[in-house]
Amino acid sequence: MEKNLSSRDDDALHSLSASSSYDSVYDLLHYHERGNGLTINGKPSYSIEDAGEQITRDNVSWNGSNVFGKSANLTFKFLQSARSTPDGDTGFVKFNAAQVSQAKLALQSWADLANVTFTEVTGNQSANVTFGNYTRDSSGRLDYGTQAYAYLPGSGSASGTTWYNYNVDNIRSPDKMEYGRETLTHEIGHALGLNHPGDYNAGEGNPSYNDVSYAEDTRQFSIMSYWSEKNTGGDFNGHYAAAPMLDDIAAIQRLYGANMTTRTGDSVYGFNSNTDRDFYTATSSSKALIFSVWDAGGNDTFDLSGYSNNQRINLNEGSLSDVGGLKGNVSIAHGVTIENAIGGSGNDLLIGNGADNVLRGGAGLDPRFSDRCR
């Protein structure tokens, strides 16, 4: 447990007994402990590393089979025509402007994490990753079933292709925090070599969270999962992640290595963000955040000052935080140090990580705990 206690003001300390303060800190520090032989929801709990291996269990990337930590320079393409998908679906529709824009943001979110670059090609040029829509199933009927699918890397003609059901509203009009953007990021994950965390697929039987291989197979930990974050105690209030989550970061870095050029300066996440990433940027108190941070260096800050909710903010790597009225919606990847945090106008709990933390509670009664805190 963190040893030294300091506070924004004495009132915060007087308002909470020492016992209740430390109980609150203990609860947050041990918020969804995982791995180490634990069982959660009757399922084995996997560490972040074990989950990353599970999500990449086919051990394939654009570098071949059983090649790990090697960079890849990839191409992508928005198809202009197709007779049918590899599954036989028909009624091709090319990506519209909104889909193109959101797909490029989704590609960027993967490239930030690992040593993967994406270059767009057009015309008759072949590409590693392709995008297209379909509207009808193999029998020619309008398809309202499977919403999207993709193929892992390989040498076949289907490899790296991603397909989307244009009959679905939020597939046609994807946006941050909604299902359409999440779907783009998910399918690109497949095209890069990531599996679902468990052996299930849409349209094959009736799988549920009861069938998962390990407890953390939820959207709280992986954008590749089908299952609600509520199964592991999170609550995104109906929103979806736009970018890879905690276990996805471990997975993609296992295949291609960690991108150590990403945000090496002093980065701000949340309000007043300078990351140039929509999913790391809070624009108003009514807009939610859902993200896992990958950051390669600098003196970095979580600025959550615009929220009035009571927040629990933990700066330790691998941790979960409750931000902006959601639960377990912000996490920090292994190997990442976030030095500073700014709370909002609610009663926030802030926990540092042993770096030279600056923890500012804002308004409200805000106990702060860190090994070294200013």
Describe each model-derived feature in a short phrase:
Residues F271-N274, R312-T337:
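Acidic/polar low-complexity surface segments
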Residues G297, G306-S308, E317, I342-N347, ...:
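Extracellular, beta-strand-rich repeat scaffolds characterized by small/acidic residue-biased motifs
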Residues M1-F95:
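Disordered inhibitory propeptide/activation segment of secreted metzincin zinc metalloprotease zymogens
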Residues Q220, G265, L289, G298, ...:
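Cysteine-rich, disulfide-stabilized extracellular repeat modules
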Residues G156, G160, N165, D175-K176, ...:
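Low-complexity, polar/charged sequence tracts that form flexible coils or short amphipathic helices
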Residues F236-A288, A296-T301, G306-R312, L326:
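Extracytoplasmic and endomembrane cell-envelope/extracellular-matrix remodeling and assembly machinery
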Residues W110, V293, F302, I313, ...:
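Hydrophobic "rung" positions of tandem beta-strand repeat architectures
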Residues L29-S71, A98-Q220, Y226-D235, S284-A288, ...:
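Metzincin-family zinc-dependent endopeptidase catalytic domain
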